[in-house]
Swiss-Prot record:
Uppermost EC category: hydrolase
InterPro entries membership: Cellulose_deg_GH3, Fn3-like, Glyco_hydro_3_C, Glyco_hydro_3_C_sf, Glyco_hydro_3_N, Glyco_hydro_3_N_sf, Glycoside_hydrolase_SF, Ig-like_fold
Keywords: Carbohydrate metabolism, Cellulose degradation, Glycoprotein, Glycosidase, Hydrolase, Polysaccharide degradation, Secreted
Lineage of the organism: Eukaryota, Fungi, Dikarya, Ascomycota, Pezizomycotina
UniProt-recorded name of the protein: Probable beta-glucosidase J
Pathway(s) annotated for this protein in UniProt: Glycan metabolism; cellulose degradation
Record organism: Aspergillus fumigatus (strain ATCC MYA-4609 / CBS 101355 / FGSC A1100 / Af293)
Residues of this chain annotated as glycosylated in UniProt: N330, N447, N503, N764
């Protein structure tokens, strides 16, 4: 990097640089130069810095044919750990991964709120609770910054659904905005001072977030005193002068749409002053300065790490995120079903057993160094000879990716050949050998999901070009195979020269590729085992598509294609086979759930149900084997109509590289579960508070539940959900006693000088080491409140590891303002009302709750962090 990368460069140096910049150079600095890099000014030593997605791994600069990376458990999994030290360590790992990818800025964490269970990106965020979200984000950011990399809080604010996300206006009261949706950002900024904040795609009360002065100028920078950079989400800038004047420093990606000549015109017409321009430039230069701590050169090559210590940390995180929802007694032994016995034969059933559901979809997805399925994790622990598998049913939304099962024609390597052309294929079809085109690029690939947003080649100047995918497929057994082709563009799939899938002539809009692609079109073909069947795809990029314009979605240039396939399954027969095996098995694990097919950026789920056939499978297995252990993988709640029948039940999320090992570690007792639900699991979709007002209607979504999000709604209305926020069992037992609450400076005029010190004694009353999570809630005055408030709200938490019989005092300090205040819309400030509050300390298990009174002596109004 150039001279500006000197650590500790002072404000005077930036002032000097600004004075030497030309007007054109200032304007150029305020937008990206390409998908992932900022603009450089070599003559002044201002380098380009690189950004990368986030939030659960550092992908690097390529969606298309990228370099593999470490994948962390998803956001809800990390939230479930309630472990700030662990999240800090994972932040350090992310920083190391960023440096390996040559990146200076990580686009994470995501700290939007899951106001309902259907949000496509719900898995990315930590929790439905703003305090848990904000404190977890502070730990995440601190860990990333400890490694010299800049984290980015996203998305400011109310990016809580994917439906029409760039067009929808979130209509939310000032009180709910402050108490629920902005509070995670407020706490994360207070706790970590991250170097960047990303604005959301949507409008907030009628105005896009990236040009919203009330959010950026008044709250973020004015009230909170935030000094970092504000950057747009990718293609999330919608104006020239309005965005600059509101405080949006950096438009991404490049080339610019709203800066460049358009901003020069705004300057010459006094729509934007040079003073404001200099303010935006200063923030970009400060971001470059801060990013220099990573010690990463400009445009550094991307490489892999995959270190043993990282794999160990990822395995720990996967195991510690698994929530034990139920663990009833085995009727024959009168002991809890879990942990299982590794000496017994284990039957593993279900669609997720042999599936590596390691991350959700969209910008959080990445090519992992490796993945571990639950079946593999169990087999590695118990020995392959001790594990039997039965499919039961499929769980995919789109057919499993075919790429790694193909072989190249030329060398027989795993994968396929991807050729790129500037000209369309001949009318007769390029697969017939009449193709006289010369490819401009030829790549060997294994991932048959090819998103071309960041693909580039010197001979390709626009978004319109063509490609072929070619390889052979040798099926393990004869039978009917189903193939699927999804495109943002056009595509034809041929098997042995026969057209099997036409996704060109007639196309149907779907949710693929961030909402700009088609549904998966499918076709069938009988294939013979041991025979090499020729697989060929003709593809045209997004401009060749026959689909109409997609309203409310982001268009990512050239589009992409996805090729899947598998043996066709008769679900009824497969379920019956699984049931027959389960009836005779020593112990049974049923792995079900969702995957990145079902939960992804670009679309919301239409319902909470598990994939077709799943509930039938679970019910049938439980009917013959009531002690079967059910493992659910999902990033957000799913319906479990069989939950009351199940005696042993785990929520395992998307566990990253080590997902399967983490599940196996908990199943067999190598990890004692300590995780708690960071989300409420309703019994059915209609029970959740956002049910009537989740989708965009005529360009708006009404946040009708107001402040009663998640458990606040269920506690206040007295409705019992399927599983409560904070629920999670352990193989150990714990006892809480001696709760004390002490207030410092109770009469201080400035409430920021006052805090609560909550102390409780925690004992491990079992013979097994285990970790207890103490949750601290505050109940407002029952009669004296001037506004309606939730029955209780989480205000702090602490996790403590205890040996058998060990007792420790756990102390949690909470700012009094955070503990007692609500947002008073009348005075546009936080108000802590005097009165009698109650502090609850909640531990694992029914009845493990202590309550102590707290008297707030004086009412106080406050603002800021």
């Amino acid at each position: 990097m150039g001279s500006i990368d000197t650590v500790g460069m002072g404000q005077r140096a930036i002032d000097q640089i600004i004075s030497e910049l030309s007007l054109n150079e200032k304007v150029a600095l305020l937008s990206g130069v390409d998908a992932w890099h900022t603009f450089a000014i070599p003559r002044l030593g201002i380098p380009s810095i690189r950004t990368t997605d986030g939030p659960n791994g550092a992908r690097g600069t390529r969606y298309f044919n990228g370099v593999p990376s470490a994948c962390l458990p998803c956001g809800t999994a990390l939230g479930a750990t309630f472990d700030r030290d662990l999240i800090f360590s994972l932040g350090q790992l992310l920083a190391a991964e960023c440096r390996a990818k040559g990146a200076h800025v990580l686009l994470g964490p995501t700290i939007n709120i899951q106001r309902g269970p259907l949000g496509g990106r719900g898995f990315e965020s930590f929790s439905e609770d703003p305090v848990l979200s904000g404190l977890a984000a502070a730990s995440y950011c601190s860990g990333v910054q400890d490694g010299g990399v800049v984290p980015t809080l996203k998305h400011l604010v109310c990016n809580d659904q994917e439906h029409e996300r760039v067009a929808v206006s979130a209509l939310v009261t000032p009180r709910a905005l402050r108490e629920i949706y902005l509070l995670p950002f407020q706490l994360a900024i207070q706790g970590a001072r991250p170097g960047a904040v990303m604005t959301s795609y949507n409008k907030v009360n009628g105005l896009h977030a990236s040009e919203n002065p009330g959010l950026i100028r008044d709250i973020l920078r004015g009230e909170w005193g935030y000094e970092g950079a504000v950057i747009s989400d990718w293609f999330g800038t919608y104006s020239v002068a309005d965005a600059v004047n509101a405080g949006l420093d950096l438009e991404m990606p490049g080339p610019t749409r709203f800066r460049g000549p358009a901003l020069m015109h705004a300057l010459t017409s006094n729509k934007v002053s040079e003073k404001t321009l200099n303010e935006r430039v200063r923030k970009v230069l400060e971001l470059v300065q801060l990013a220099s701590r990573a010690g990463v050169p400009e445009y550094a090559p991307e490489r892999k790490l995959n270190r043993p210590e990282d794999r160990a940390l990822l395995r720990r995180a996967a195991g510690e995120s698994v929530v034990l929802l139920k663990n009833d007694k085995n009727d024959s032994t009168n002991s809890p079903i879990l942990p299982l016995d590794r000496e017994k034969t284990t039957l593993v059933i279900g669609p997720n057993a042999d599936l590596a559901a390691y991350c959700g979809g969209g910008s959080a997805s990445l090519l992992a160094y490796y993945t571990v399925t639950p079946r593999q994790g169990i087999a590695d622990k118990c020995g392959a000879e001790q594990v039997v598998f039965s499919q039961g049913c499929y769980g995919h939304k789109e057919l499993p990716l075919l790429g790694e099962h193909l072989r190249t024609i030329e060398t027989g390597q795993p994968g396929y050949t991807f050729r790129v052309y500037t000209e369309p294929p001949p009318a007769s079809g390029s697969f017939k050998g009449s193709d006289s085109r010369t490819p401009v690029d030829e790549l060997h690939m294994t991932n048959s999901s090819a998103f071309l947003m960041d693909y580039s080649h010197p001979q390709i100047s626009g978004d319109t070009y063509y490609a072929t995918l070619e390889g052979t497929f040798e099926p393990p057994e004869s039978g009917v195979y189903e193939f699927g082709l999804t495109v943002a563009g056009t595509g034809l799939l041929y098997i042995d020269g026969v057209l099997v899938v036409d996704n060109k002539t007639v196309q149907r809009a779907g949710t693929s590729f961030f909402g700009i692609g088609t549904v998966e079109e499918r076709g069938e073909r009988y294939l013979e085992a041991g025979k090499k069947h020729h697989v060929f795809v003709e593809f045209g990029t997004a401009p060749t598509s026959n689909l109409q314009h997609h309203h409310g979605v982001v268009s990512f240039g050239p589009g992409g294609l996805r090729l899947g396939g598998c043996r066709k399954l008769d679900t009824d027969t497969a379920i019956q086979q699984a049931v027959q095996s389960a009836a005779q098995a020593d112990q049974v694990v049923v792995c079900v759930g969702l995957s990145g097919d079902w939960e992804s950026e670009g679309f919301d789920r239409p319902h909470m149900d598990l994939p077709p056939g799943t509930d039938e499978l679970v019910n049938a297995v439980l009917a013959v084997q009531p002690n079967a252990v059910i493992v659910v993988q999902s990033g957000t709640p799913v319906t479990m109509p069989w939950a009351d029948k199940a005696k042993a039940l785990l929520q395992a999320w998307y566990g990253g590289n080590e997902a399967g090992n983490g599940i196996a570690d908990v199943l067999f007792g190598d990890v004692n579960p300590s995780a708690k639900l960071p989300l409420t699991f309703p019994r059915e979709l209609a029970q959740n508070p956002s049910y009537l007002s989740y989708r965009s209607e005529r360009g708006r979504v009404l946040y009708s539940e107001d402040i009663y999000v998640g458990y606040r709604y269920y506690d206040t209305t007295g409705q019992p959900p399927l599983f409560r926020f904070g629920h999670g069992l352990s193989y150990s037992t714990f006892h809480l006693r001696d709760l004390t609450v002490r207030e410092t400076a109770p009469y201080a005029a400035n409430i920021k000088e006052s805090s609560l010190r909550v102390s409780v004694t925690v004992s491990n009353t079992s013979a097994r080491p285990g970790a207890e999570v103490v949750l601290v809630y505050v109940r407002p005055p029952a009669a004296a409140c001037s506004v309606g408030r939730p029955v209780r709200e989480l205000k702090g938490y602490e996790k403590v590891m205890l040996q058998p019989g060990e007792t420790r005092e756990v102390s949690i300090t909470i700012p009094l303002g955070l503990a007692t205040s609500f947002w008073d819309e009348g005075c546009d400030a936080w108000l802590s009302e005097k009165g009698l509050y109650f502090v609850e300390a909640v531990g694992t298990g029914e009845g493990n709750t202590l309550v102590a009174p707290l008297t707030v002596q004086v009412s106080r109004v406050w603002n800021g962090l």
